[in-house]
Amino acid sequence: MSENNGDNIELLSENDVARTIARIAHQIIEKTALDAPGTKPVLLLGIPSGGVPIASQIAQKIKEFTGVDVPVGSLDVTLYRDDLRKNPHRALQPTNLPLDGINGHHIILVDDVLYSGRTIRAALDALRDIGRPDIIQLAVLVDRGHRQLPIRADYVGKNLPTSRGEDVQVFIKEIDGRTAVVLTRGTEEA
């Protein structure tokens, strides 16, 4: 499970990530009653860039386990971030939503790593401008702690406590050519 390469430690291998995504899919199936009569339509919205392929993989697992097709979209939060002044030249990513919008839907935001909570706050602001879903939940592959806002995930693949001087990187095969979760050690912040 854990492979050390200098200052980089592989915390989750490709197989570990696949098992973790399957576990998240099972949690969503259990908590949402996807195909029960009268349930709100579920929509997985990945936050670019890491959350989008993870949302797709979760949807694939849900279909494999239940036969239910859960739609997947993406939600760009760039213009809603509170740190735009620090890095004003960010590339905008596409936002892809169902044609019928998000009103009345059960939205599950999907991201790769939950850290300060600021990205999720930006996602909530973006959703507010787009429509009014009935339920908004959060699924993350990794929760590394250090929240700056009162935000928690409803579905957590792996809790990986870190120091503030460390970084957790999620590599996804479709983007990076390999799948792994890696801890990079840095200097401890004062």
Swiss-Prot record:
Molecular function terms from GO: uracil phosphoribosyltransferase activity
Function: Regulates the transcription of the pyrimidine nucleotide (pyr) operon in response to exogenous pyrimidines. Also displays a weak uracil phosphoribosyltransferase activity which is not physiologically significant.
Catalyzed chemical reaction(s): UMP + diphosphate = 5-phospho-alpha-D-ribose 1-diphosphate + uracil
Pfam families: Pribosyltran
UniProt enzyme class: transferase
Keywords per UniProt: Glycosyltransferase, Transcription, Transcription regulation, Transferase
Classification of source organism: Bacteria, Bacillati, Actinomycetota, Actinomycetes, Mycobacteriales
Tree of life domain: Bacteria
Encoding gene per record: pyrR
Protein name stated in the entry: Bifunctional protein PyrR
